[in-house]
Amino acid sequence: LSLHGIILKSRETDKTFGFDDTYVDLARALRQPSRQGRNYREFADARKNLRTIIDGRVQIDDESGRWSFRKGNQKFAIGVTAEGVKKIAILDTLLSNRHLDTRSIIFIDEPESALHPKAISEFMNIIMILAQSGIQFFLASHSYFVIKKLFLLSQQHAMSIPVLSAEGQEWKSNDLIKGMPNNSIIDESISLYEEEVE
């Protein structure tokens, strides 16, 4: 969010190609205004839950083009706002301006990054709500919390969640509906727990 203006200026004004198209596309999508009116029920529920996690909202000032985080009557520059808040705010913005629909595909690298465990769990709940509406998610994670929460959601909703795990030069596929996969992240988490219990 803090590079939003620079990304757009480099491509649209300066005509340089310093940023990958995915960043340019995201910056363009984020500058679209929120739309009023009825939205998919799942999207409205997800937005409500997203705002609960960050206890506020992110908005852009139309005149300055700068992003800020609003929490109650307080306003903070986006540069001093936590990275986890920014990540969640991006998803909220894309839902509010209707850039996302039930056929969208979202890639999130390390969704756990800069979020405390309770927020990670809530974020996974939101991803499940959106996935049930039709949005397809691809997540890359090194977090036991993420894997375990997705496993629990898969069991609770009887929903297939395919998982690919790298083991050396090989890839192993599993489905969380069938159980937790064996991989180094899970093995190390269990090992630490067992070490503490002993």
Predicted regions and their residues:
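Short N-terminal micro-motifs specific to bacterial/archaeal maturation
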Residues: G72, G79, A114, F137-F138
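C-terminal lobe/lid and adjacent interdomain/linker elements of RecA-like ASCE P-loop ATPase modules
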Residues: E122-E198
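Walker B motif beta-strand of ABC-family P-loop ATPases
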Residues: I105-F107
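Short, contiguous clusters of charged residues that form electrostatic/catalytic patches at enzyme active sites
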Residues: K86-A89, S121, N125
